[in-house]
């Protein structure tokens, strides 16, 4: 098997039609792509969002993570890895990463009067 046959889908290997992926894609996939592009463009701009919206996505993924841990081949090891990762994430908060090149100077801020926060939905950190 050549590298071309291993990488490209069968419809491209046999017919040579380079537009087969585009023409055979269902309409709903294009709708999902447009929605993701719209949401991504909104996420790239600085805006104010309410704090409860910051916890929405992590709360959605928490049951999925727990089910994945329970269904893994070694749930004790996976659970231990999850707890270690969670502890490391809480220990190495954004405040503690001043020297890292991938951390910008911008910080998440919360307006307590209007209960709005900046656009950092993934960088949720708690102060205990």
Curated annotation (Swiss-Prot):
It is a multi-pass membrane protein. Its main location: membrane. The chain crosses the membrane at residues 19-41, 54-71, 75-97. It comes from the Bacteria. GO terms for cellular component: plasma membrane. Keywords: Cell membrane, Membrane, Transmembrane, Transmembrane helix. It is found in: Cell membrane. This is Uncharacterized protein PM0739. The lineage of its organism: Bacteria, Pseudomonadati, Pseudomonadota, Gammaproteobacteria, Pasteurellales.
């Amino acid at each position: 098997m050549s590298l071309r046959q291993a990488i490209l889908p069968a419809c491209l290997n046999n017919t040579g039609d380079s537009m087969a992926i585009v023409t055979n894609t269902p309409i709903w996939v294009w709708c999902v792509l447009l929605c993701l592009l719209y949401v991504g463009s909104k996420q790239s701009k600085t805006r104010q969002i309410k704090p409860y919206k910051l916890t929405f996505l992590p709360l959605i993924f928490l049951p999925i993570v727990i089910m994945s841990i329970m269904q893994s081949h070694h749930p004790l090891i996976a659970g231990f890895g999850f707890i270690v990762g969670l502890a490391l994430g809480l220990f190495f908060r954004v405040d503690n990463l001043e020297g890292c090149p991938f951390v910008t100077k911008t910080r998440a801020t919360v307006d307590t009067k209007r209960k709005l926060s900046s656009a950092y939905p993934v960088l949720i950190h708690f102060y205990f």
